[in-house]
Amino acid sequence: MAKVDLSKYGISNNIIVVYNPSYEDLYKAEINSENKGFEKGIVTNTGAVSVDTGKFTGRSPKDRYIVKDQITENTIWWDGNINKPISRTIWDNLKDLTIKQLNTAKKLYIIDAFCGTNNDTRMKVRFIVEVAWQAHFVTNMFIRPSNYELDHYGDPDFVVFNGSKTTNPKWKEQGLNSEIYILFNLTEKEQIIGGTWYGGEMKKGMFSMQNYYLPLKGIASMHCSANVGEKGDVAVFFGLSGTGKTTLSADPKRYLIGDDEHGWDDNGIFNYEGGCYAKVIDLSQKNEPDIWNAIRRDALLENVTVKADGTLDYSKVASKTENTRVSYPIHHINKIVLPSRAGHAKKIIYLSADAFGVLPPVSVLDEKSSQYHFLCGYTSKLAGTERGITEPIPSFSPAFGEAFLTLHPTQYANVLAKKMKEHNATAYLVNTGWNGTNKRISIQDTRAIIDAIIDESIEKAEKIYIPILNLYVPKSLSGVSKGILDPRDTYTNRGEWEEKAKSLAAKYIKNFEQYLPEGEYLISSGPQLS
């Protein structure tokens, strides 16, 4: 590839620069004995390198801001929580701070990659980082250009400057949340990061940008995993972190398209990424063989306990965080589609980890209830995926990905509903959380439920109406434990379920008020208290 003139970014051309290094070169750099602090990588007995991201073991959404200017003023969803505005002055100050940090580096890594498998909609993204394992992370997670594509890469569509070693000393006077920052400038098409080492800020940053650009073109942008069967039947799994997107889409009977971020255009479903980013807390070979086997050379583990002999301890009791992760190139999964795209989706599955044991393991949705539950995006926030979350709490996340939405939720709902109607797709709400036994629904039962959705046997099953929640559930399904499909049966006292269900229904109803009066036609498709 042609040498990049760093001076246009304010970075000295005298710094040693490594362009799109090989996995072998990244491996050597990560385990270099001269590495200090969180730059250090540890070789594990699997061949994968493990790193520690410090105190930032998850994203920091409260430190995420977007420059408010003529381009973004009337397009960004300025909700004051997810998308918070900053001035151009603050941006300029913190970009200077980031560039100064990068100018102190002995060596920089430049990774030119693609975000999106479709040539006409993909973003060319340039990552400029000073930590070898961060270069490894984006090499795993984004689409790796061929040598020919690198030679003809040209100018990037977006540039990410990662200054994780610096912090913002002026954050209080600037009215920001803390000394760390994750900022976006859609006019300059740049992201800057300071103070946090967590690699997921780069991954989710570019997802947020695709969530801005693609729906404006009529393309659905989705926080989901996706796979495809032998007959070309595509299933999409929406869900927040920890609900099972990665685990359930890695199905040995089907081919993986991707595990987290996808678009849906006139040609079908396509992946934004070139890798997977799986949670590994309490990982077992029996329950998640594909992820287990993907942890080998070129995979990158985060915050996993490594014993003195190099063996890994995935157990919750041994881990510093519940958000232990591994990134790996998608070709570490045996059954994949390359390039990572397929036809139009037929099955839309909304995953929820209900911590309160109220939702059924599976509910069959119609067109309106599908839109209702997509806009609500109910789950329970699970420990570790964000700073400050240590216990499960009920959460409503529009589009099952509120933290990454840059446009109003209804824009995503409208585009998805249009695609589903055009291609006769059906939707289901699947609870991967808990029931009245205070135990989590087993992965074996959930997989059997997914099988019933895919093979459509769920459509033939007799349905039961669940009051209050206003949902229809199958009476029985092959391979699913008896007595769990109706959540009321998991309680020794049905009155306890009813009390919890009314409490959750009230939360649904209160949450949906934000979509009124426009969404009034959907109210009858949600939970009811009268």
UniProtKB/Swiss-Prot annotation:
Main location: cytoplasm
Binding annotation for ATP: 204, 223, 239-247, 288, 325, 440-441, 446
Catalytic activity field: oxaloacetate + ATP = phosphoenolpyruvate + ADP + CO2
First-level EC class: lyase
Signal peptide: none
InterPro entries linked to this entry: PEP_carboxykinase_ATP (IPR001272), PEP_carboxykinase_C (IPR013035), PEP_carboxykinase_N (IPR008210), PEPCK_ATP_CS (IPR015994)
Free-text function comment from the UniProt entry: Involved in the gluconeogenesis. Catalyzes the conversion of oxaloacetate (OAA) to phosphoenolpyruvate (PEP) through direct phosphoryl transfer between the nucleoside triphosphate and OAA.
Protein known as: Phosphoenolpyruvate carboxykinase (ATP)
